[in-house]
Amino acid sequence: MRELVEIIKGIGIEGAKEVEEKVDRQFYALQYLFRHQDPEMFIKLVIANSLVSYQLTGRGEDWWWEFARYFSGREVDSIWKAYGEFLPKSKNNRRLIEAKLNRIRKVEGFLSTLTLKDLEGYYKNMKMLWKALIKIMGSREDSKTIVFTVKMFGYASRIAFSRFIPYPMEIPIPEDLRIKSVTSKLTQEKPTKFWMKIGQESGVPPLHIDSLIWPLLGNADLTPLDIELRNKLMKLTELLGL
């Protein structure tokens, strides 16, 4: 565990930021949508889309690109109605459509009250958005969809406000099947607890640690990164037994 803490500390928040912005195809999809959508609606759509990004029928990256292309240049009066048209035709997200539309209906009332300035306020205090979504959606604090939504909101806000704010340390890692599988090789502890400890000891918040692990699981192209960061990620790959 000490070696794991040291390598993540060596990568740091800045290294995680570089991975997010140069390797994560979801980040590229959001940059594309931002260029073709109103900034306020862009962020609201990203929140809504994150809340229905589960039980996919395709790869996550493909789903986010499908979303970005669909809403590019599209005028949206009601997010719920827009998804009522989008999801049934979607290639990468066709399961549990009614349940997903219900989730969007739940959050739309909240989103409709927010201005761009309000959204910027939530970016400055992402913990506040996390707590608000937990209450609105009736979810647990460590719900993987809720914490993933905060992560994608952070991406969207970073793009929209041209400013990087690190994720709060208190928000846990999204505990999906891949994270569970990787963690089980390292510890018997619950993944959210284990990575929270690693985060606190390394100084890198769990949502940023998630950004380091995911590309390694999916054999992402790391060539856009500088050689020093690539070497650190290769070392992390070894430590995770990938």
Curated annotation (Swiss-Prot):
One of its GO terms (biological process) is base-excision repair. Keywords: DNA damage, DNA excision, DNA repair, Hydrolase, Lyase. Residues 120-184 are annotated as: Helix-hairpin-helix. The active site is at residues 144, 176. InterPro entries: AGOG, AGOG-like, DNA_glycosylase. Its EC number is 3.2.2.-, 4.2.99.18. GO terms for molecular function: class I DNA-(apurinic or apyrimidinic site) endonuclease activity; oxidized base lesion DNA N-glycosylase activity. 8-oxoguanine binds at residues 26, 53, 64, 148, 174, 210, 214. It catalyses: 2'-deoxyribonucleotide-(2'-deoxyribose 5'-phosphate)-2'-deoxyribonucleotide-DNA = a 3'-end 2'-deoxyribonucleotide-(2,3-dehydro-2,3-deoxyribose 5'-phosphate)-DNA + a 5'-end 5'-phospho-2'-deoxyribonucleoside-DNA + H(+). NCBIfam families: PRK13280.1-2. Contains two alpha-helical subdomains, with the 8-oxoguanine binding site located in a cleft at their interface. Contains a helix-hairpin-helix (HhH) structural motif and a Gly/Pro-rich sequence followed by a conserved Asp (HhH-GPD motif). DNA repair enzyme that is part of the base excision repair (BER) pathway; protects from oxidative damage by removing the major product of DNA oxidation, 8-oxoguanine (GO), from single- and double-stranded DNA substrates. Belongs to the archaeal N-glycosylase/DNA lyase (AGOG) family. This is N-glycosylase/DNA lyase. It comes from Pyrococcus furiosus (strain ATCC 43587 / DSM 3638 / JCM 8422 / Vc1).
